Regions:
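Flexible, surface-exposed loop/linker segments and immediately adjacent secondary-structure boundaries
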Residues: 1-24, 29-146, 150-185
């Protein structure tokens, strides 16, 4: 479902968060993870489960449908099974290993003169990226690397430099208060 949210709103499994022009959204999760959405983005919480006492049940499955985000992974993806975290995009699937990364899905002129496709910048940790076609092409992206995936059938390509896609969220997005012990906020 898609619903309007405000500071302190709870976002449930299946919910889609849409940011408008000049609007950022910061979602905080009960495992300590955080997602900051750029303006004109669409992000869905496909599945989320975190119980501090049951690391084997951890699940964080998200979809970046449109736009861009920065994420800091929480305990899910750092504990028992790092494959329990997954970020789907129209062109690739991302798995993390204790990570801070930016992902931007550019379509049309949403990123100015930058070519359409998925752009990934890893700040800390590493990301395993796989295109979404039947052709299984996987690449491990380390901190300081930049990757581009043009479409679901093209393999991820390491870029020589960071693409010129600005992401400058304000220092504080809404209230910095911690969310409830349940799911994402």
């Amino acid at each position: 479902t898609t619903k309007a949210i405000s500071i302190g709103s709870k976002v449930d499994e299946g919910d889609t968060v849409v940011t408008e022009k000049k609007t950022y959204a910061r979602l905080k999760f009960s495992d300590g993870g955080e997602v900051t959405l750029k303006p004109n983005s669409q992000f869905q919480v496909d599945k989320y489960n975190y119980d501090e006492g049951k690391p084997g049940d951890d699940t964080a499955m998200f979809s970046l449908i449109k736009g861009g985000l920065r994420t800091i992974t929480g305990q899910i993806g750092k504990r028992l099974n790092p494959d329990s975290y997954q970020m789907k995009t129209p062109t690739a699937v991302l798995g993390v290993r204790g990570t801070i990364y930016d992902a931007h899905f550019c379509q049309g002129n949403s990123c100015g003169s930058i070519a359409p496709g998925l752009y990934l910048a890893v700040t800390n940790g590493s990301v395993v990226i796989t295109n979404t076609s039947g052709i299984q092409t996987t690449l491990q992206v380390k901190a300081g690397q930049y990757v581009y995936v043009q479409n679901p059938t093209t393999p991820p390509v390491v870029l020589p430099a960071k693409p010129d896609i600005p992401f400058n969220p304000p220092p504080k997005v809404g209230a910095a208060a911690a969310g409830p012990a349940g799911g994402p906020q």
